[in-house]
Amino acid sequence: SQSVFLIKIPAHSRWMFAIGCLVLAAFFFISFFFHRKGILISLVGVLAAILFFINGTYSFQLLGQDEIAWSEPNSMKIEKYKWTDLEEVVLHIPSYEQRRYEGLEHLMVFTFKDGNILTMVRDKAFTDQIGKIDGSIRRYQVEYRTEDM
């Protein structure tokens, strides 16, 4: 959709898909040796892999023109908010030493009026869309500030 300008998929999702593929391959390999139970073993493997695939699918962070949505890893619950539901946005800036030696990155923390919090790493994909994100923050007059880590 054109109204979505950033979707972040955490490493957790990629791991879930990789584990699902390995589980599927392992069950197919095992079913090769057990001819009588091969179909049952394959079916169990497919079902186990599907669980990992579903778990990986429900882990994302989304920023759009109209909404902010995310789902935590290992959760099937999707949190959806409008930009008007935001209380404040805080950019946490690590020091030079923290970035260089500890590998810390800038963090954007979105705090909602109901107390829910979304933390996003401000990486290259985020920075590429910063104009649209800042535009939404200004358009909806959300309090914005920076803090040192």
Map each language-model feature to its residues:
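Conserved beta-hairpin
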Residues: 42-81
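Membrane-interfacial entry segments at the cytosolic side of transmembrane helices
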Residues: 33-44
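Short, structured coil/loop segments at alpha-helix boundaries
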Residues: 10, 34-35, 75, 126, ...
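N-terminal secretory/membrane-targeting helices
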Residues: 1-8, 107, 112, 149
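N-terminal membrane-targeting/pre-transmembrane regions
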Residues: 1-32
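Non-transmembrane, membrane-adjacent beta-strand/coil modules in membrane-associated proteins
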Residues: 72-127
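Terminal and domain-flanking low-complexity segments
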Residues: 121-149
